[in-house]
Amino acid sequence: MSSCATPTSLMPHALDLANLPDADVVALALEGREAAHRELIRRYERPVFSLVFRMVRDRELAEDLTQDSFIKVLSHLDRYRSEFKFSSWLFKIANNVAIDHLRRRQLDTVSMDGSPHATTPDAVMASAIELSDASESALEEMEAKELGSAIEQAIARLRPEYRSCILLRHVEGRSYEEIATTLDLPLGTVKTYIHRARHELRPALEHTRE
């Protein structure tokens, strides 16, 4: 064994991986530790699946695309830059996998069931999409429970790029800056996409109001 190998005392057992930050688990995965690979999948398989499922609205397909996403992620961990959040890098890859599929198959379905991080019905309801903005009072008045099939269908008709931004902004609750990092887009482009998406959604939103 090389003299510069990680000392045994500093190498956590599999049960200890859950307490390590993402960057440390990634470092161990880069050393070839299968337990670290499994830990990354354990942490993010559900949120990645939920994100992809919202894009394609097909469970079996979402499972396949989630698997494809993790294959890409684990095969290219050496490209991850530790100054960025691992989750942002991971979601960018998963988002690109879903968008590539949508473009190829021209699918246009989406689910609005709340944040992929939600693990209980209450959490799902609390994180369900809420299209609101201080400058757009019509959207601000909408509550998640009022967003029925008309809104869901309207979002499904958005361009994949707009859809990704809307989902990350209003389902994930991410800032414009985080969306720009996740999707590898200029900040101005993200704001433009969200503005255009809201404009396209407005007729459907107004149609649901009394």
Residue ranges and their predicted role:
Residues 1-27, 31, 39, 110-161, ...:
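Intrinsic, short, N-terminal disordered tails of RNA polymerase sigma-factor systems
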Residues 26-49, 74:
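A short, charge-rich alpha-helical start-of-domain segment used by transcription regulators
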Residues 30-31, 57, 70-85, 104-106:
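Sigma70-family region 2
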Residues 41-59, 76, 155, 200, ...:
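Amphipathic, Lys/Arg- and hydrophobic-enriched alpha-helical face
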Residues 50, 64-71, 84-96:
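Structural recognition of an alpha-helix C-terminal capping motif at a helix-to-coil junction
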Residues 78-82, 92-113, 144:
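Arg/Lys-rich amphipathic alpha helix in sigma70-family domain 2
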Residues 165-169:
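A short pre-motif secondary-structure segment
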